[in-house]
Amino acid sequence: MRAWLNGDLMADPTQAAVAVTDHGFTVGDGVFEAVKTVHGRPFALTRHLERLERSAAGLGLPVPDLDDVRRGVEAVLEGEGEDAPMGRLRITYTAGPHPMGSGRGGGPPTLVVAWSEIHPAAAETTVVTVPWTRNKHGATAGLKTTSYAENVIALAHAVERGGSEAVFANTAGNLCEGTGTNVFYVVDGELRTPSLASGCLAGVTRGLVVEWCGAREVDEPLSEVLAVASEAFLASTTRDVQAISRWDDRDLPAPGPVTRQCAETWAAREAETMEP
């Protein structure tokens, strides 16, 4: 792993360096991005940084210096990252040191860019619907914040039941998203995915799949989706297009014909440019 903190490459990323009063640490007052790298080159970095700005604005944080973020990305990828077939960048931007509690003080924000090598995701996976819901009207709906406790609990619930991802409905009972993925499904040959109005995150991979594969954005009850979908897949930065072979107690073709075409389209378009 390599890490860059507030302008400096860290000699040892495992050593304590962020203030214990950092609001990102104490109350989850921060935003982040996870960016895939391919042989040391970040994929769709500009799109990720645009979302970082939107999330920061939604949380009321100062506007991040994106040139500074890019310098951090270059620093952690130089050398080691270039030799790795696949890696993950984690860009974390927090409110910085503040008084204990929810109230903010006047501390400067904290910016961390970290990178580590990862392995490609499996071609297919299983998912579990969880009993908790996403609040599409919540203050942080659609923002990629560091407040991930809800996702940790949901993912643990899914893993205990043999899944690699948890799937949420929203408070209206409609399909929303996974803990770190967007969900696509097929009905009567048509590719569909929940709209952003459902409260799901505007995933970078989601947006590209919608553009490249022509998915229709529609909000439907999760129970109906599970009953009628002929195939389904997850989309995320590190999973790309990953077929769902089992959803709760239902087996699905993995990949089905539409999922296979989406995966092939994704691979071809990704190979064309690193800044789609």
For the regions a protein language model found, what residue spans apply to each?
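Helix-start/capping segments and mature chain N-termini
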Residues: M1-E78, T94, S102-P276
